């Protein structure tokens, strides 16, 4: 929310992405990649020991949580990274688990959004990889075919959520009673971060129902009504009426709640340029409008650039870790469209988010931050003057977005600086978040030792943080076709 973050990248990055030039000696690159693989295995081993087959490890108390309906979210979300790392043992464990999941059974409400990006996206990306560049990793092909069947099973369980007057789905649903939470609106990111996975499911199965459902919901976002729902070309509000499909506000943001809608626009175009040219046009409009209307430079650090929010004629000078995928989105779009101006702006956004890491005591960025010089807390004036931002929420819950954008910057430019930024971020996460059994979130990234620890290891640690850190340093990865490489990446989401 990706909340995202996260987004799932079944999208294929164009082969026009510049392949990075090796700067470190090969043995140094290999040692970094090995360190990331060790951290992944450490988190996986703790999960298997204390939490499997539940959703997530509680890495402080060495227990388990079931925040994602008890279907084993960490296992499913970890699949594509285990494949990229070529860890056949873990891949086999995950495939055996997925085969046993009954997606029709849970005692809790189901989030259509979270279930799509973690479970459906995890299975489909694993399927594509094991059918393609990693086909040699699993001998029993029936286990690979099972991934698609389970994806279809899950889609069939969830699809009633779209049965509304407009086709805009409910997000929080009861799969047993086919009920919902009674919401009257759905969020921009929640509605707009389904279409890639559901379209891919249709393309793989030949059943067009999944694509039609998700694309009908998306259609309201591509042609927003009323006009107040689109304050600037391409930039739309954050809530949509489930009854009518009309926008109910004009609050514009790249933050959580809106973020991955913009992420998926470009990824849909990359996935299939012929079918989804309109998505590209809407992304370009949003990207250009953001440069014109949302780009903001802190008074104390005018060299930095962030994207502000907008509501009813006013800019909000605050942002989130979640929004830091924005640099990567600009870099992807700029590269695919051969737009140097968008690449340059994307690198500015990457540099801005990099400072939120470089300037804290832990070297890890906060959940949210601001740069309004009129609202600087008294105890953060020195930080604001030096760094160009102040911390609003100092939490870090193992989010991937900053490392994600560093990865894109390295892939697009080949500059060592961005690879080193990925490594530094990984080292700090390994230093401050690591526990005996896994990795825990931090309560305050700008406190000594990160303050306290949150007793939760989110599944996107496996799916995104470890994947981007590994792909940045993996020996020989630069020779892997860029399209196949990004097929393995799950982004905001």
Curated annotation (Swiss-Prot):
Domain of life: Eukaryota
Principal place of residence: cytoplasm
Cofactor: Ca(2+); Mg(2+)
GO MF annotation list: calcium ion binding; mannosyl-oligosaccharide 1,2-alpha-mannosidase activity
Catalytic activity: N(4)-(alpha-D-Man-(1->2)-alpha-D-Man-(1->2)-alpha-D-Man-(1->3)-[alpha-D-Man-(1->2)-alpha-D-Man-(1->3)-[alpha-D-Man-(1->2)-alpha-D-Man-(1->6)]-alpha-D-Man-(1->6)]-beta-D-Man-(1->4)-beta-D-GlcNAc-(1->4)-beta-D-GlcNAc)-L-asparaginyl-[protein] (N-glucan mannose isomer 9A1,2,3B1,2,3) + 4 H2O = N(4)-(alpha-D-Man-(1->3)-[alpha-D-Man-(1->3)-[alpha-D-Man-(1->6)]-alpha-D-Man-(1->6)]-beta-D-Man-(1->4)-beta-D-GlcNAc-(1->4)-beta-D-GlcNAc)-L-asparaginyl-[protein] (N-glucan mannose isomer 5A1,2) + 4 beta-D-mannose; N(4)-(alpha-D-Man-(1->2)-alpha-D-Man-(1->2)-alpha-D-Man-(1->3)-[alpha-D-Man-(1->3)-[alpha-D-Man-(1->2)-alpha-D-Man-(1->6)]-alpha-D-Man-(1->6)]-beta-D-Man-(1->4)-beta-D-GlcNAc-(1->4)-beta-D-GlcNAc)-L-asparaginyl-[protein] (N-glucan mannose isomer 8A1,2,3B1,3) + 3 H2O = N(4)-(alpha-D-Man-(1->3)-[alpha-D-Man-(1->3)-[alpha-D-Man-(1->6)]-alpha-D-Man-(1->6)]-beta-D-Man-(1->4)-beta-D-GlcNAc-(1->4)-beta-D-GlcNAc)-L-asparaginyl-[protein] (N-glucan mannose isomer 5A1,2) + 3 beta-D-mannose
Cell compartments where the protein resides: Cytoplasmic vesicle lumen
This protein's pathway: Protein modification; protein glycosylation
Cofactor binding note of this UniProt entry: Ca(2+). Can also use Mg(2+), but with lower efficiency.
Glycosylation sites: 87, 174, 489
GO biological process: carbohydrate metabolic process; ERAD pathway; protein glycosylation
Disulfide bridge partners, by residue number: 324-353
Signal sequence coordinates: 1-18
GO cellular component: cytoplasmic vesicle lumen; endoplasmic reticulum; membrane
InterPro entries: 6hp_glycosidase-like_sf, Glyco_hydro_47, Glycosyl_Hydrolase_47, Seven-hairpin_glycosidases
Coiled-coil spans in chain: none
Assembly information from the UniProt record: Monomer.
Recorded family membership: Belongs to the glycosyl hydrolase 47 family.
Name of this chain's protein: Probable mannosyl-oligosaccharide alpha-1,2-mannosidase 1B
Organism: Aspergillus fumigatus (strain ATCC MYA-4609 / CBS 101355 / FGSC A1100 / Af293)
């Amino acid at each position: 929310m990706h909340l995202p973050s996260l987004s799932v990248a079944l999208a294929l990055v164009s082969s026009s992405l510049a392949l990075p030039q090796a700067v470190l000696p090969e043995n140094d690159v290999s040692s970094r990649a090995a360190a990331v693989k060790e951290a992944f295995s450490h988190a996986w081993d703790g999960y298997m020991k204390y939490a499997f087959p539940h959703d997530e490890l509680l890495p402080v108390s060495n227990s388990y949580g079931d925040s994602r309906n008890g279907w084993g979210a960490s296992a499913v979300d970890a699949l594509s990274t285990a494949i990229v790392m070529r860890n056949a043992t873990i891949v086999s464990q995950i495939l055996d688990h997925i085969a046993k999941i009954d997606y029709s059974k849970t005692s809790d409400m189901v989030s259509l959004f979270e279930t799509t990006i973690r479970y459906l996206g995890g299975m489909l990306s694993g399927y594509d990889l094991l059918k393609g560049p990693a086909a040699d990793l699993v001998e029993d092909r029936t286990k690979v075919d099972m991934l698609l069947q389970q994806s279809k099973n899950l889609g069939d369980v969830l699809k009633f959520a779209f049965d509304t007057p407009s086709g805009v789905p409910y997000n929080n649903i009861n799969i047993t009673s086919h009920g919902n939470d009674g919401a009257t609106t759905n969020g921009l990111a929640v509605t707009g971060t389904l279409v890639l996975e559901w379209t891919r499911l249709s393309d793989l199965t030949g059943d067009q129902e999944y694509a039609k459902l998700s694309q009908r919901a998306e259609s309201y976002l591509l042609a927003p009504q009323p006009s107040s729902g689109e304050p600037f070309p391409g930039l739309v509000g954050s809530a949509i009426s489930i009854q009518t499909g009309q926008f109910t506000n004009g609050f514009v943001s790249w933050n959580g709640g809106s973020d991955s809608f913009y992420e998926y626009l470009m990824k849909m175009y990359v996935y299939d340029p012929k079918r989804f040219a309109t998505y590209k046009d809407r992304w370009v409009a949003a990207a250009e409008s953001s440069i014109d209307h949302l780009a903001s430079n802190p008074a104390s650090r005018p060299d930095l650039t962030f994207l502000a929010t907008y509501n009813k004629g006013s800019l909000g000078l605050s942002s989130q870790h979640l929004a830091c995928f924005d640099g990567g989105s600009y870099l992807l779009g700029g590269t695919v469209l051969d737009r140097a101006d968008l690449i340059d702006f994307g690198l500015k956004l990457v540099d801005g988010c990099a400072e939120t890491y470089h300037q804290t005591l832990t070297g890890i960025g906060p959940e949210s931050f601001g740069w309004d010089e009129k609202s600087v807390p008294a105890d953060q004036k020195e930080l604001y003057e030096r760094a160009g931002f102040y911390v609003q929420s100092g939490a870090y819950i193992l989010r991937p977005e900053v490392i994600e954008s560093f990865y894109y910057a390295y892939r697009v430019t080949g500059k060592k600086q961005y690879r080193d930024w990925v490594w530094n971020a990984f080292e700090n996460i390994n230093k401050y978040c690591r526990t005996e059994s896994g990795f825990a979130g931090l309560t305050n990234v700008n406190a000594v030792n990160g303050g306290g620890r949150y007793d939760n290891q989110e599944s996107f640690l496996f799916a995104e943080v470890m994947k981007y850190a590994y792909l940045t340093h993996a020996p020989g990865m630069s020779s892997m076709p860029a399209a196949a490489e990004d097929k393995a990446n799950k982004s905001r989401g």
